Amino acid sequence: MADINLGQLAATTLQKYQPKLVDNIYKKHVILNHLKANGGTVMYNGGRQLVVPLMYGTNSTVQTFDGTDTLDTTYQEGIDVATYDWKFYNVAVAFTMVDKIKNKGKEQVLSLLKAKIKQAELALSEKINTDLISGSDAKGLVGLLTMSDATSTVGGISGTTYSWWRGNIDSKAVTVSFSDMRAVKNSCMNGNGGSKVSLIVTSQAIYQKLFALLTATYQFNPTQAATKEGKRLAEASFEMLEFEGIPVVYDEAMAADDMFFINKDNYKLGILEDANFAVIDKSQPSDQHVSIQHIVFGGAAYTDRRASLGQMTEKKSA
């Protein structure tokens, strides 16, 4: 039997699997899934930073007039930009000569390759998802915990300094309630430039508490969603409730007492075209019998309106 070129087989296998890998990542994690299905993932071909225009003021020159009335042409402030740095993630898929020796035959080697690729896929997707929720590493994505608060600097703009650049927060240490959820939800939808909250994400503990508060009829058929997005998420196998027309889901990466309110129109994931879970050609160290493939992701989580985002923290589920 001809000798198996492990590096070549690994490269070919990973390249063929890459589209499925991307699909799996978006299927597994509900925030990514929601953004992907609703125009919340935006492709970029590069640039030093991701620059996002903001509108934080109103135009005061709006007026009624008649005939030869003088029109107000006062120059308007209120336009700014937020800048987000690109963040990069890498996972290595390594195969050694010993792997090949211990797994004789192409089928056995291929089985090992697929297992290692799946392992890399899961590790990379978990890391990106966790950072998307609560990331605080300067090299990683800005997490929702930071992006939806009221004081952090996001996109180069301080929430402490500018009141219009703040999320809506409820940090009272009380048992979660629909009335408190309603207050945060409504605050996220107030003002110009925003739109309806499109997804509420919480922990399993809080989700189960909300489920217990619902009627027995709804508990009997919890996937009987009223909204299009609710039905889509249920059909995608996500556990889902609806609160005033908004899907409520849970994610394992959420802190036990947290809840986030997301608006797909104002919260996005920018992705670099050349680093969209790209497979990088193999490298072989000169001092080791190792063949290495890399899977690379580059992007930035961003918002153009923090006031459209909300968070509840310190909520009790019992």
Predicted regions and their residues:
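Flexible, glycine/threonine- and acidic-rich loop/arm segments that mediate assembly and lattice contacts
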Residues: 1-318
